[in-house]
Amino acid sequence: MVKYSQEPDNQTKSCKARGSDLRVHFKNTRETAHAIRKLPLIKAKRYLEDVIAHKQAIPFTRFCRGVGRTAQAKNRHSNGQGRWPAKSAQFVLDLLKNAESNAEVKGLDVDALFISHIQVNQAAKQRRRTYRAHGRINPYMSNPCHIELILSEKEEPVKKEPETQLAAKSKKSAA
């Protein structure tokens, strides 16, 4: 049993999925995860499919030095800097589909699910080498990552009492 950094509030109304040591760039995956945080499952899947098709961009907010600007990233809590990290989007989309099938097995309502928690952590770097002039060797590192996510059902808010009854009670206490 693997440990998640956060446990869901209601275990019966949520499901989890996790990927470890995924060979995909950490920085791109972090921005992708940040873009779909708190979205409903259906919207998140559609958004990631649009990113893969280059119809919508992922706004880059933290790891954005040298990232070009695009109109697709405007008005998404960024100054217009964005990219289309297709490989990261595909990995996160596969995890969302895995979590969705876990929800179906649990008997949850798939249409009511939203991403309550998604987190990307750095994994151990993988080392390769590249050969340079004059017999030198430089490192050629990759930056894989771990991804974990939790889908939860939207909880129905408690119904508020009608105002007419509240007003009647307050008048009686004042008189």
From Swiss-Prot:
Which CDD domains does the entry mention? Ribosomal_L22 (cd00336)
Q: Does the keyword Membrane apply?
A: no
Q: Which GO terms describe its molecular function?
A: mRNA binding; structural constituent of ribosome
A Pfam short name: Ribosomal_L22
Q: Which SUPFAM superfamilies match?
A: Ribosomal protein L22
Q: Which Gene Ontology cellular-component terms appear in the entry?
A: cytosolic large ribosomal subunit; cytosolic ribosome; mitochondrion; nucleolus; plasmodesma; vacuole
A biological-process GO annotation: translation
InterPro entries tied to this protein: Ribosomal_uL22, Ribosomal_uL22_CS, Ribosomal_uL22_euk/arc, Ribosomal_uL22_sf
Tell me which family the UniProt entry assigns to this protein.
Belongs to the universal ribosomal protein uL22 family.
Protein name, as recorded? Large ribosomal subunit protein uL22y
